[in-house]
Amino acid sequence: MSQAEFDKAAEEVKHLKTKPADEEMLFIYSHYKQATVGDINTERPGMLDFKGKAKWDAWNELKGTSKEDAMKAYIDKVEELKKKYGI
């Protein structure tokens, strides 16, 4: 697992033939943020921002996960999605 593999996966996920399910997208989003930013560093969105709260909660669940572990999980998930949805 390398930065180049991670960058390639981040590009490939944009070209899937079908949009992944919301839960799959939350996994991709949260692991990307953990790998690139680290632990969450923002306040939880307001009560009516349902999408923002879901994304924040997914990222917050990864607090303490290393950059390397987040990158590996992200790459593995993108590979799974490529097989499921095509590219």
UniProtKB/Swiss-Prot annotation:
According to the UniProt entry, which residues carry Phosphotyrosine?
29
Which gene is this protein's source?
Answer: DBI
Modification N6-(2-hydroxyisobutyryl)lysine occurs at? 55
Which residues are recorded as binding an acyl-CoA? 14, 29-33, 51, 55, 74
Record's function text? Binds medium- and long-chain acyl-CoA esters with very high affinity and may function as an intracellular carrier of acyl-CoA esters. It is also able to displace diazepam from the benzodiazepine (BZD) recognition site located on the GABA type A receptor. It is therefore possible that this protein also acts as a neuropeptide to modulate the action of the GABA receptor.
Q: Does the keyword Manganese apply?
A: no
Source organism per UniProt: Bos taurus
Q: What is this protein called?
A: Acyl-CoA-binding protein
Under SUPFAM superfamilies, the record lists: Acyl-CoA binding protein (SSF47027)
